[in-house]
Amino acid sequence: MISELCTFALATGATRVVLRHEGGPGGRIEAPNWHSGGFLIVNASGRLFRVPLASPALEEIPTGSVSGLNNDHGPSPDGRTLAISAKSETGGSCIYLMPVEGGEPVRVTPRTPSWWHGWSPDGARLAYAAARGGGPVGVTTCAVDGSDERPLAPGFDHADGPDYAPDGAWIWFNGERDGSADLWRVRPDGTDLERMTEGETVDWFPHPSPDGRHVLFLAYPPGTRGHPADLPVALRLMPQDGGGSREVLRLRGGQGTSNVPCWAPDGGAFAFVRYPA
């Protein structure tokens, strides 16, 4: 399986292939974050890697006693801490925090399953997808110490991918309701729920840009169930204050392409992964 770790510049429309990986050590590359220190963070075969933009190569980030990471991870707003998601001692996914350079993770969420997706702009809270009490997966937040867990936006068949707007005023997510899979946003206190897309495509993983202008999201073909890999998909942009979206890239991908926040710190570019056939 070939993985191409790429960046896309909004001003020029240029795609740069940062790293072309043909399997081997690390396996399939997935879910890039763009760190302010000039490197990307990716998952490959349940391990985390740093990829310096100036001299691209996979450099493993040690995760101590925690293994089998999934592709839901991301650095804190100050760039010092990394949120990761991995199987707990009891088997369900939970969220851990660790130094961005690597180290022994500290478990945050006492309950499982929990899959991290976003930091609040002040670094005080985490947004994640969680299933509780046998119910469907939904949008949830908690304090960084795992306390004050708050489920948001009930009433969806499935809700996932929550990510904060840069001013902290909204949490964007993808939600399935009444047979439609669209993007939504809600206030951090659970009020003012608002549908932001409505169309034939199956929309996943909204990521508001740090400059407050855009939301990047992944659009699957109509009728797609879940967020599978290796399909013809599109990356689309829409304004953060609402309105129509536009396609910026068409590629082979899906799962692993843009699961987590992937914007450059200035909002002028984003990272993604594609999987050429």
Task: Give the ranges of each region predicted by the language model.
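Histidine-/acidic-rich catalytic cores in large beta-rich domains
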Residues: M1-R16, E30-A31, F39-F49, G74, ...
